[in-house]
Design a protein with these regions (language model features):
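ALDH superfamily catalytic-core signature
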Residues: 1-113, 142, 176, 223-224, ...
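Conserved C-terminal structural/oligomerization subdomain of aldehyde/semialdehyde dehydrogenase
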Residues: 50, 77, 100-234
Length: 234
């Protein structure tokens, strides 16, 4: 994969809308030989994000929806830290002029267990957890090891690997070398605990349609042929 492109995509996908997005990138699996370089670049990009007033054109991340939600997000990170995970970027609420708001720094977590809550649960905050994988089989298995299945992305220069990932990752939307953009012509919906049905595209029409079956018989006989199974004609 292109580490620079993947790092930018991961950071933007994790913190867009404050991470308060159903399709946000909340966890990433990086091939082991690229792990250190990728996490270092992600941390660098996160540290460079300007947190503050969303009306300021220089701001890259504004406030979360409420103080209660900010505290919930911080709780995930604090518990991960207490369980032995490493926080390579963020992990704190900014002070100074922003101390009174519901702000939280873009956060990068590594060293978390696959079955930990920060990997398995939806955080809805600007938090990205990164874990290594050694083979495509393992990477796809880890990606699918979650109760959710709304969105995923695969970052690779190899066409065959991208086709395999997009086919085998159990998510309703899979991007290749991007994350987040959605167009109205394409269906949007998930698998597993992410629900069923689709919005957007022609598939969404069914979600707004009450389908009714009306059948009128033109057979005037009192005894219909299909009723023979009940009335047992001799």
């Amino acid at each position: 994969a292109d580490v620079e492109a993947a790092a930018h995509g991961a950071v933007a996908g994790a913190i867009i809308n404050g991470g308060q997005d159903c399709t946000a990138a909340t966890r990433a699996y990086v091939q082991a030989p690229l792990f250190d370089a990728c996490t270092a670049r992600v941390a660098e990009l996160m540290d460079a994000v300007v947190v503050g007033d969303p009306t300021d054109p220089d701001t890259g991340l504004g406030s979360l929806i409420s103080h209660a939600h900010r505290d919930k997000v911080a709780g995930f990170v604090d518990r991960a830290r207490a369980s032995g995970a490493q926080i390579l970027a963020g992990g704190v609420a900014p002070g100074g002029d922003l101390a009174a708001g519901a702000f939280y720094r873009p956060t990068l977590v590594t060293g978390a267990a696959q079955d930990s809550e920060i990997v398995q649960d939806e955080i809805f905050g600007p938090v990205l957890t990164v874990l290594p994988f050694t083979s495509d089989d393992e990477g796809i298995a880890l990606a699918n090891d979650t109760p959710y299945g709304l969105a995923a992305s695969a970052w690779t220069r190899d066409l065959n690997r991208s086709l395999r990932a997009s086919e085998e990752i159990a998510a309703g939307c899979v991007w290749v070398n991007d994350h987040i953009p959605i167009v109205s012509e394409m269906p949007h919906g998930g698998y597993k605990a992410s629900g069923f049905g689709k919005d957007m595209s022609v598939y969404s029409f069914e979600e707004y349609t009450n389908v009714k079956h009306v059948m009128m018989s033109r057979d005037t006989a009192a005894h219909k042929e299909w009723q023979d199974t009940v009335f047992k004609q001799r």
